[in-house]
Amino acid sequence: MATKKTPRRTAERILESSLALFNRFGEPGVSTNAISADLKISPGNLYYHFPAKDDLVNALFAQYEQALEPVLDAAPAVAHVEDAWFFLHSLFEVNWQYRFVFRNLNELLSRNRLLEARVL
């Protein structure tokens, strides 16, 4: 018997695929149709969960902030070179995971006022 995918899982899959595609090709180089095709879902299904591409970007940025928070919280505990190395490694690891943000930051901020308000 086939298991039914829950709407929450579909939204998670959309975000995972979007992140991978945005990181690989840059956010401007990825259409919602490309994301739908990658997931083998209809564009309407994608738009049900994320009505606009900026909604995807905002959701991914929220994930980035969540991933970054524990790393930044550890900063005051850095007392030795080894701690600093680990802190920087962790910081760069999170930034690499969401590298599309930095790749196209100016364009994202000029188009997306919600993101601009969160960043600036």
Q: What are the roles of these predicted feature ranges?
A:
Residues 59, 73-117:
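Hydrophobic alpha-helical connector segments
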Residues 62-68:
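Short, basic, alpha-helical segments at the C-terminal edge of helix-turn-helix-like DNA-binding modules
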Residues 1-9, 20:
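N-terminal intrinsically disordered/low-complexity leader segments
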Residues 13, 21-55, 59:
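Helix-turn-helix
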Residues 13, 67, 83, 87:
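Charged catalytic carboxylate motif
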